[in-house]
């Protein structure tokens, strides 16, 4: 296959494109990007046939900031006949054998989502045809490749596959989370998604456990504090603004009316530091660096608000600088990762884990 198809948020195509160009170059794979503003996807077309599979295998999806999902794809199938869309798709997937799952998807745009009802109905007969051809196993198998059929317009689709160990578990790379009725704000979904994304499911019980101490900088009205409280943590909520009364009534929250940039925790036995403040990203990064150098927390999740242009370059520079500063100050054992999550807007979410080599 010659294309790498990447799902992203509409409006972030240039950032996703810039990132995949850099990552492909690191693997000495040549190609060029094809995308349009607000399409919510990017195509990286390789110069050499077969290189798309190399990218899909060797670039970790989790290491990409702006891509929600990716798969190796054939050239765009155009003009799929209404009377038989299935045959051309089955033919295009002839080189795929014994895949474990089928996903018929669209980009995350209002225009493309108008096809979602069709995609649901189309999945059933397409699945049967792919099973008959041998491209798809009779029973779903989470260890086998995933077939993707992405309709970008009526009668037009990219088809291909992703590897199950390097693929989002969600259709279109989008987790479907519901906001709780008593959550103080919709921002609560950002931290909920961040915990799901950055902390492996099998480690959540030990790394997000009841009784832990946490600090929320810029907490008002308590959207992020809510996620910490519902996991049984005790939270120092730092903000000059008011906190949600329901959270205060739990007895798990102590409200410090202070500036998050000036606050120093009275006790340093903090497991989680979280921060979602509307501030220059470099200033937030410097704040987290200071806390890390002082050894005041074990793990942190924080948001970096993005500029209007050159967002990939800005984030990359900030993360590289953070790594350099931490190492210069004796913090050597850490991991850092960033993702433009579905519930993020003009921001990216960063996870910094100190001493990740130690068992939890």
Curated annotation (Swiss-Prot):
Active-site positions on this chain: 305 (proton acceptor)
Gene3D superfamilies: 3.30.2300.20, 3.30.70.2810, Vaccinia Virus protein VP39
Alphabetical list of Pfam families matching this protein: FtsJ (PF01728), RlmM_FDX (PF18125), RLMM_N (PF21239)
Enzyme class: transferase
GO terms under biological process: methylation; rRNA processing
UniProt key word rRNA processing: yes
EC number: 2.1.1.186
MF term (GO), any: S-adenosylmethionine-dependent methyltransferase activity
Location in the cell: Cytoplasm
Keyword match Transferase: yes
InterPro entries for the chain: RlmM_FDX, RlmM_THUMP-like, RNA_MeTrfase_FtsJ_dom, rRNA_MeTrfase_M, SAM-dependent_MTases_sf
Keywords (A to Z) from UniProt: Cytoplasm, Methyltransferase, rRNA processing, S-adenosyl-L-methionine, Transferase
Cellular component terms per the entry's GO annotation: cytoplasm
Catalysed reaction equations from the record: cytidine(2498) in 23S rRNA + S-adenosyl-L-methionine = 2'-O-methylcytidine(2498) in 23S rRNA + S-adenosyl-L-homocysteine + H(+)
Binding of S-adenosyl-L-methionine, residues: 187, 220-223, 239, 259, 276
NCBIfam families registered for this protein in UniProt: PRK11760.1 (NF008734)
Function according to Swiss-Prot or TrEMBL: Catalyzes the 2'-O-methylation at nucleotide C2498 in 23S rRNA.
Subunit text: Monomer.
Family to which the UniProt record says this protein belongs: Belongs to the class I-like SAM-binding methyltransferase superfamily. RNA methyltransferase RlmE family. RlmM subfamily.
Official protein name in the record: Ribosomal RNA large subunit methyltransferase M
Organism whose genome encodes this protein: Shewanella halifaxensis (strain HAW-EB4)
């Amino acid at each position: 296959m010659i294309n790498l198809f990447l799902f992203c948020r509409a409006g972030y195509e240039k950032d996703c494109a810039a990132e995949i160009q850099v990552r492909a170059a690191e693997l000495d794979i040549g190609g060029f990007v094809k995308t349009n503003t607000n399409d919510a996807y990017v195509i990286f077309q390789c110069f050499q046939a077969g290189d798309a599979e190399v990218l899909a295998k060797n670039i970790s999806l989790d290491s990409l900031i702006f891509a929600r999902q990716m798969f190796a794809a054939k050239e765009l199938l155009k003009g799929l006949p209404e009377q038989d869309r299935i045959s051309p798709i089955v033919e295009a997937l002839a080189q795929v054998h014994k895949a474990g799952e089928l996903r018929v998807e669209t980009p995350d745009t209002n225009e493309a989502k108008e096809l979602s009802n069709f995609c649901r109905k189309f999945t059933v007969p397409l699945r049967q045809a792919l099973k008959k051809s041998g491209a798809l196993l009779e029973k779903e198998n989470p260890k086998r490749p995933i077939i993707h059929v992405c309709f970008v317009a009526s009668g037009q689709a990219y088809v291909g596959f992703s590897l199950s160990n390097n693929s989002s578990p969600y259709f279109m790379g989008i987790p479907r989370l519901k906001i709780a009725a008593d959550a103080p704000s919709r921002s609560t979904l950002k931290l909920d998604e961040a915990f799901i994304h950055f902390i492996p499911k099998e480690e959540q019980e030990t790394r997000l456990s009841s009784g832990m101490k946490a600090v929320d900088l810029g907490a008002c009205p308590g959207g992020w504090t809510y996620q910490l409280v519902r996991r049984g943590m005790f939270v120092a909520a730092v903000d000059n603004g008011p906190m949600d009364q329901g959270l205060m009534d739990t007895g798990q929250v102590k409200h410090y009316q202070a500036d998050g940039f000036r606050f120093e925790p009275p006790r340093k036995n903090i497991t989680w530091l979280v921060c979602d403040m509307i501030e220059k990203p470099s200033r937030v990064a410097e704040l987290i660096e200071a806390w890390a150098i002082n050894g005041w927390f074990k793990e942190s999740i924080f948001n970096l608000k993005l500029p209007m242009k050159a967002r990939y370059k800005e984030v990359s520079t900030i993360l590289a600088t953070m790594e350099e500063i931490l190492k210069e100050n004796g913090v050597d054992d850490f991991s850092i990762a960033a993702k433009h999550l579905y519930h993020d807007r003009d921001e990216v979410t960063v996870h910094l884990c100190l001493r990740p080599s130690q068992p939890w």
